[in-house]
């Protein structure tokens, strides 16, 4: 079986001391590839370095100025295009809306989101969307901007079923983390149950969101298998089918083979 971690932050300092061991555990678990996300200016350099060094497992890069970061110089379509045109950067993201950490007039956040979508369209690259307590508004913008043309995924999905279906209708996919293994995530598991497997991806969002039985510890790409196991249990499917379909979905999204 082959798995993919569609969203990781193994470029973060939490992995600075043992990244080779993390990659070896990833390989041993059957996780053949991962997306490495850069969220700040300059972070793309480490992402590009990791992608260039990767063999097995394969790493693919993504970059965007994260929607939580208000107190930084605003980006531009030109800056996003310049950074994300690198061949090591396979996707634009994570970008989107965050109503959990950011309050007040968030027009700047929506404008930033639209700039990333414009750049992604120009580059012909897919978009990784961060939407926290803002899923419905994010999907509205994605639909308005016809982001399905480039392909997009709502990462670390935590919204309701109607919004997830609207995301799929707009041409996107929905990705789930280890949160679906949490005891209090019954409503989210029902969303997983109702969605077609052909529209799902799996991720760790490591070092955050470690699944049960690792909850409270540092997350890592090998643990994406626990997410796949939970989806298989929820949907009463074999783990092999969940692995195969979610990996195919990722390849279609990222427009890469491995």
Go through each PLM region and give its residues.
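Mid-domain alpha/beta scaffold segments of enzyme catalytic cores
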Residues: 1-258
